[in-house]
């Protein structure tokens, strides 16, 4: 019975579910009702589970305690006797013993415990004095607010208040810095906006908007379209309306009455403010000069009144063509807009965010928002201009200027009189020159001369080096030839002739430091000689007179030979069949470290040569003979199913043993969250990375010791 009770409590508390299993909970209650000993044993097991370092285990154990507390007087007596410890384990009233992770489960445990303690006090507070005292202790001493949804303790509230004060202080300081930056940069931003507006006025010198509030170019076209059908004032009327009659007044169409306005609007867009001034000028001119219908038609380029004029305003907005006239203005506007987009607008947006977080800089916030709207409006205006780049004008101008500069660099020199750069073959005898040799003979003779010249120069260079074999041979020849100049020459024997031929074929190796110290075990070079310190006080206790330098010693014993051949990349692959059914993709030159010598194989990984196929079959048979039949995984599974004993069949097919989780349903506390800090720590504090850093630092220290070995600071170490 005790084993069954322990198993039930273990399964219920380690399930990791928010609600308890009703069937298992029913069995647990039935066991607890059987005797008081079983109830006491269940209480001890639950207290043990409440001390576990996992909030989900404590939450499930508390739910069991709540179920048993409301049903058993004996269980209430046991719990009230250890009520303080119970509160510390469920509510975290002791700041030195906070609730364990995970945080969400700990928060749910605290809320459930708070509601349960309040309900227990209302129902059983009068009967159990310790329960009422515990509730009073929580409410008045620990200052626990039972109406608080988050169920925070005094220490937690204090920590959150301090954290909020710290954040408010940071936001205030950030807003103060933004205020100072705004005061410093406001004039610069306004100057930049003024430059952009002036550039726009130079590019489009017409007033598009009737009121200063509307600043978008898109509204200009709509206003112009709306203005086109409006009737003109009497001062701008046609001669017929002014009282001048003609023979063609009856045939004049209605649109001819607006010829002045139509001609004024052809090919451009005119603002509404300019119309009254134009009308006043025209009326004053009409008063001074007599009006004539023919003069009116001729002045406006019209032949007669028999046709109509339709003025179409493009609906797609403006289009500014880039040319040589507005190139400088466009460059200035682009520079200012680039400064706005890359510097001013992000800075102003950051000001708005800082002032919003602080919440106390309403005036500065409004000013920053207005400034942001002006900057965005300037960028939108530039987009609505639809600037079309010039078609090759700039490139042609620059190319022309570059060609002129290049032509100025050359100085014209007159040709030399009588100079012939090439003498014909039939005139070479006339100039006293030898006839030109054939091309093949000339090339062959030139190649032979060059080869002889290189051989002679190489011999002279070798003879000039006293350490070379050629110089030694030359010295020996001088010594042998000087005592007997008149002696007859002795023919060399066959062995000497063979040696001379081998010497002639032997390659010439340049003399290096390794040949100088070849075969010597005790090298004098590569050692640092330390002199004894003559100071009275700064003197090391033990001085090594000679210190070997590993770097220099390695140079004296080794030689770097450059590979003179050509590198041929590996084109073939191993293509051996892997256990997962795929082919090996390693591109080793001769031997694969996993599958041995690389041999030609087909698409299925089988060897193409019969000898290789037979050899692999023999190796496979040897491996099968070395592995006993009773260790076959399928056979072991059948035996396990028959006997019920674990023979390790599940581990036989795997490389590693693996560790099974004890409670897989619980949240793994050792699993770290995938944050940026965790990923950086994994890379920075990796074993290989730490070893590389240590090796680099040791190498730096060794170099300092070798370089400053005579200084007392390094001599004492």
UniProtKB/Swiss-Prot annotation:
Record location of the Glycyl lysine isopeptide (Lys-Gly) (interchain with G-Cter in ubiquitin) cross-link: 416
The organism's place on the tree of life at top rank: Eukaryota
Residue span of region VHS-like: 2-145
Residues with PTM Phosphoserine: 284, 291, 403
Record key words, sorted: Chromosome, Coiled coil, DNA damage, DNA repair, Isopeptide bond, Metal-binding, Phosphoprotein, Ubl conjugation, Zinc, Zinc-finger
Residues reported to bind Zn(2+): 574, 584, 592, 595
Gene Ontology CC: one annotated term: nucleoplasm
Modification after translation: Monoubiquitinated at Lys-416 in response to transcription stress; this promotes efficient transfer of TFIIH to stalled RNA polymerase II.
Coiled coil: 169-199
Gene Ontology terms describing biological process: protein ubiquitination; response to UV; transcription-coupled nucleotide-excision repair
GO MF term list: chromatin-protein adaptor activity; RNA polymerase II complex binding; RNA polymerase inhibitor activity
Record flagged with keyword Metal-binding: yes
Compartments in which it is found: Chromosome
Protein name: UV-stimulated scaffold protein A
Organism expressing this protein natively: Mus musculus
């Amino acid at each position: 019975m005790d084993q069954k009770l322990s198993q039930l409590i273990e399964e219920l508390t380690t399930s990791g579910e928010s609600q308890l299993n009703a069937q298992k909970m029913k069995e647990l209650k039935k066991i607890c009702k059987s005797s008081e000993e079983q109830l006491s044993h269940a209480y001890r097991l639950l207290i043990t589970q409440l001390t576990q370092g996992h909030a989900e285990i404590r939450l499930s154990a508390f739910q069991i305690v709540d179920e048993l507390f409301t049903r058993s007087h004996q269980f209430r007596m046991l719990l009230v006797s250890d009520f303080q410890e119970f509160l510390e384990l469920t509510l975290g009233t002791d700041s030195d013993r906070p609730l364990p992770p995970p945080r969400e489960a700990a928060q749910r445990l605290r809320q459930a415990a708070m509601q349960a303690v309040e309900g227990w006090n209302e129902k059983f507070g009068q009967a159990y004095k310790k329960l009422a005292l515990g509730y009073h202790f929580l409410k008045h001493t620990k200052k626990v607010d039972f109406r608080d949804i988050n169920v925070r303790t005094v220490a937690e509230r204090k920590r959150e208040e301090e954290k909020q004060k710290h954040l408010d202080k940071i936001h205030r300081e950030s807003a103060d810095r933004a205020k100072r930056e705004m005061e410093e940069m406001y004039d610069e931003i306004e100057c930049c906006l003024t430059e952009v507006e002036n550039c726009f006025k130079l590019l489009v010198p017409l007033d598009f908007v009737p009121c200063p509030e509307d600043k978008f170019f898109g509204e200009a076209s709509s206003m112009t379209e709306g203005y086109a059908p409006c009737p003109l004032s009497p001062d701008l009327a046609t001669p017929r309306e002014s009282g001048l009659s003609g023979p063609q007044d009856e045939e004049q169409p209605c649109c001819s009455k607006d010829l002045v306005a139509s001609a004024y609007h052809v090919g451009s867009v005119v603002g509404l403010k300019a119309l009254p001034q134009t009308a006043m000028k025209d009326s004053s001119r009409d008063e001074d000069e007599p009006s004539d219908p023919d003069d009116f038609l001729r002045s406006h380029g019209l032949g007669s009144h028999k046709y109509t004029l339709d003025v179409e305003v493009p609906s797609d907005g403006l289009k500014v063509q880039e040319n040589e006239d507005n190139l400088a203005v466009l460059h200035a506007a682009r520079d200012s807009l680039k400064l706005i987009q890359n510097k001013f607008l992000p800075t102003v947006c950051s000001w708005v965010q800082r002032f919003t977080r602080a919440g106390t800089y309403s005036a500065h916030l409004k000013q920053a928002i207005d400034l942001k709207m002006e900057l965005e409006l300037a960028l939108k205006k530039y987009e609505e201009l639809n600037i079309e780049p010039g078609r090759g004008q700039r490139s042609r101008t620059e190319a022309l200027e570059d060609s002129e500069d290049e032509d100025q660099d050359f100085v014209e020199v007159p040709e030399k009189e009588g100079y012939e750069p090439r003498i014909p073959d039939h005139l070479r005898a006339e100039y006293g020159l030898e006839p030109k040799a054939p091309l093949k003979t000339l090339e062959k003779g030139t190649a032979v001369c060059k080869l002889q010249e290189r051989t002679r120069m190489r011999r002279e260079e070798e003879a000039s080096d006293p350490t070379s074999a050629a110089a030694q041979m030359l010295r020996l020849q001088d010594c042998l030839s000087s005592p007997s100049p008149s002696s007859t020459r002795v023919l060399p024997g066959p062995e000497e002739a063979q040696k001379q031929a081998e010497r002639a074929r032997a390659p010439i190796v340049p003399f290096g430091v390794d040949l100088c110290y070849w075969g010597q075990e005790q090298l004098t070079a590569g050692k640092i000689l330390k002199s004894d310190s003559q100071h009275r006080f700064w003197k090391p206790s033990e001085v090594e007179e000679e210190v070997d330098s590993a770097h220099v010693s390695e140079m004296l014993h080794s030689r770097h030979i450059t590979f003179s051949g050509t590198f041929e990349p590996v084109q073939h692959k191993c293509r051996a069949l892997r256990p997962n059914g795929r082919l090996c993709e390693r591109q080793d030159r001769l031997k694969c470290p996993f599958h041995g010598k690389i041999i030609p194989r087909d698409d299925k990984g089988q060897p193409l040569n019969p000898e290789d196929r037979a050899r692999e079959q023999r190796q496979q048979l040897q491996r099968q003979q070395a592995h006993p039949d009773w260790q076959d995984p399928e056979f072991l599974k059948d035996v396990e199913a028959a006997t019920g004993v674990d023979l390790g069949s599940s581990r036989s097919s795997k490389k590693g043993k693996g560790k099974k989780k004890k409670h897989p349903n619980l949240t793994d506390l050792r699993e770290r969250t995938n944050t940026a800090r965790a990923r950086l720590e994994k890379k920075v504090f990796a074993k290989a990375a730490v070893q590389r850093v240590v090796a680099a630092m040791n190498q730096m220290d060794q170099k300092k010791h070798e370089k400053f070995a005579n200084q007392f600071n390094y001599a004492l170490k």
